[in-house]
């Protein structure tokens, strides 16, 4: 089959201490400190064969994530920008949906023809973090499109336990093609759902929510905030096209952060009280978190979703005197996240279809 494959050179930076685990597995914990000179091409790849508990999916739709871009974009020394867990070469693509075309001999929950979307975090279920209920922090984690072959391909094999049926989404949109496209947005939406409602504990209806960034994660956060009853949703995004999308999915106010002082804007909108819930989805916390800090309501929350391997200036006294909290979030697995997002989309309470703005073939 054909797949969109990224390869890169293992060339750790002089100040990066490669662990024995990294040497043994070929996986880099901090990708932007190890992988250099990335090369991206469509090429032949072996057809996947299902294991006993696996299904083979014919990929129907796969979204382009900011992470995919950061695998190919580089710094001045030609190191990839993505700072997380990676192993190359591999097929990219992890926001996807597909139709079951083959099942392993022990598969019990799926059959040929089923429509599904899939978790990207391949957790083991045996390690201490998994057994304690933290699958997103699995000690043996693999990630589709990061460390194992992804879905920018004709087919992909996955364990049935990571698949979720999307019939409700297809029924909502009235046809399979649109259902598959919208279902491919489930994974990034689950990343925002996990961060906002599992990690940070959500917010009360009527609370004011700010979102920094309007990529797929930020747009999903806006849609979820609207569905959860936010009183005001304000978004900050440098792209004019994405600002328009932010309005379409639920933002009440949108701004170019280069043209305003975000913290001052939020204080004005809230009449001096500050915003209750802040979402960092821009991957630029050194710029965004200080603005959130200026506009933290009493008992306010900041949740970090965007990936950025950098230190952030913050006055911790602000968290103390405002009884506020800062949450880090990773992944999307467990905690009813996938089924709840599918229910929201199927019920029509969350519609991110406007953010599908272009379609490309594998070639």
Enumerate the predicted regions with their spans.
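Glycine-rich cofactor phosphate-binding loops and adjacent beta1-alpha1 units
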Residues: 6, 200-205, 228, 240, ...
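A short N-terminal beta-strand-loop micro-motif at the entrance of redox/enzyme domains
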Residues: 11-61, 87-89, 106
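C-terminal hydrophobic helical "lid"/dimerization subdomain
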Residues: 17-18, 268, 290-294, 298, ...
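Glycine-rich beta-strand-centered segment in the early N-terminal region that forms part
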Residues: 46-63, 77-128, 169-170
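Cytochrome P450 core scaffold surrounding the K-helix E-X-X-R motif
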Residues: 67-73
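NAD(P)H dinucleotide-binding glycine-rich loop of Rossmann-like/cofactor-binding domains
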Residues: 83-89, 94, 124-212
């Amino acid at each position: 089959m054909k797949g969109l494959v990224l390869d890169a050179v293992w060339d750790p930076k002089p100040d990066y201490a490669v662990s024995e685990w990294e040497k043994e597995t070929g996986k880099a914990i901090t990708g932007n400190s190890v992988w250099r000179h990335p090369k991206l091409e469509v090429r032949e790849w072996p057809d996947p064969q299902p294991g006993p508990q696996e299904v083979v999916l014919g990929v129907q739709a796969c979204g382009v994530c900011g992470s995919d871009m950061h695998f190919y974009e580089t710094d001045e020394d030609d190191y990839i920008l993505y700072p997380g867990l990676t192993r190359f070469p591999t097929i990219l693509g992890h926001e996807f949906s597909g139709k079951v075309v083959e099942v392993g001999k022990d598969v019990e929950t799926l059959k040929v023809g089923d429509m599904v979307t899939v978790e990207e975090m391949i957790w083991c279920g045996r390690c201490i973090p998994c057994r304690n209920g933290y699958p997103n922090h699995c000690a043996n984690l693999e990630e589709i499109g990061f460390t194992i072959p992804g879905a920018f391909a004709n087919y992909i094999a996955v364990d049935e336990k990571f698949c979720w049926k999307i019939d409700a989404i297809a029924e909502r949109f009235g046809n399979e093609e649109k259902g598959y496209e919208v279902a491919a947005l489930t994974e990034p939406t689950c990343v925002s759902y996990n961060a906002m409602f599992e990690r940070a504990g959500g917010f009360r209806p009527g609370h004011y929510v700010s979102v920094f960034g309007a990529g797929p994660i930020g747009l999903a956060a806006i849609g979820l905030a609207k569905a959860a009853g936010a009183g005001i949703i304000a978004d900050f995004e440098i792209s004019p096209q994405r600002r328009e999308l932010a309005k379409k999915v639920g933002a009440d106010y949108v701004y170019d952060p280069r043209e305003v002082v975000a913290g001052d804007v939020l204080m004005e909108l809230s009449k001096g009280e500050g915003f209750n819930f802040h979402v960092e989805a821009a991957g630029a916390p050194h710029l965004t978190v200080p603005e959130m800090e200026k506009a933290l309501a009493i008992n306010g929350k900041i949740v970090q979703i965007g990936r950025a391997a950098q230190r952030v200036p913050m006055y911790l006294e602000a968290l103390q005197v405002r009884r506020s909290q800062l949450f880090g979030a990773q992944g999307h697995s467990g905690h009813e996240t996938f089924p709840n997002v599918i229910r929201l989309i199927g019920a029509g309470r969350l519609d991110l279809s406007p953010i599908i703005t272009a379609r490309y073939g594998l070639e």
